[in-house]
Amino acid sequence: MKRLKGVIILLILLFTACGVEKEKGKEKEIEKLEYKGATNSYKYNLVIPQILNLQSEDISYFNLSLQENARLIIDELLESTDELKQDIPYEAIVNYQIKENNFGIISIVLKIYLYTGGAHGNTTLETYNIGTKNLKLINFESFFNENAQSYFEMKINDAIENEKKVKNTNGEEVVFFENPEVNIKNAVMYFEGDNIKFVFPLYELAPYSSGMPVFEFSKDEIKKYMK
């Protein structure tokens, strides 16, 4: 019954608090879809992108999966507040950035913040890269050849071992764990300008206080590893 009540509330909130706003300029094909809601127990503000005027199976999947993920986040938030009594409202915030680049790729970075109790919330990044020619989603395997993984991991290990200055997503210097295990497949990637950037999640290579490390490679440097 509690779950049914949550679903009914969720549907009401979705239909009454969903707004649309079109991006301007070069981003005119990206539409903002916004979900907002708040009570004494929780609050959420989820802003997700929707790609318009371009049609492909991957773009349809992208649009629908982001809508479904937003609904799941809200559903879980409602269920959590039903199950527990908390002093501080639980919170969910989602927003995104479109990264302009010279790779012919629509590169979108989704930032997700969730607080469901404890000392602090948790932030994660999701990235979505779509080729502007074939309108297909791009991942590490589809973009790079078989030699790329070992190259990137070698370069990242070298930067850590030699204590080169690496910054996190907030532009602050990262202090790494001792001898962290680098797996490039655990990072998300996006394209910006003439560079590709890899972002590792919290706790993967460094403590929470150091945030999410960002490693950047230029197009010229990685050209021989691109398919």
Predicted region positions:
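Compositionally biased intrinsically disordered regions enriched in Thr/Gly
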Residues: G19-K227
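C-terminal motif of bacterial Sec signal peptides marking the signal peptidase cleavage site
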Residues: F15-A17
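Sec-dependent signal peptide recognition
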Residues: K2-L10
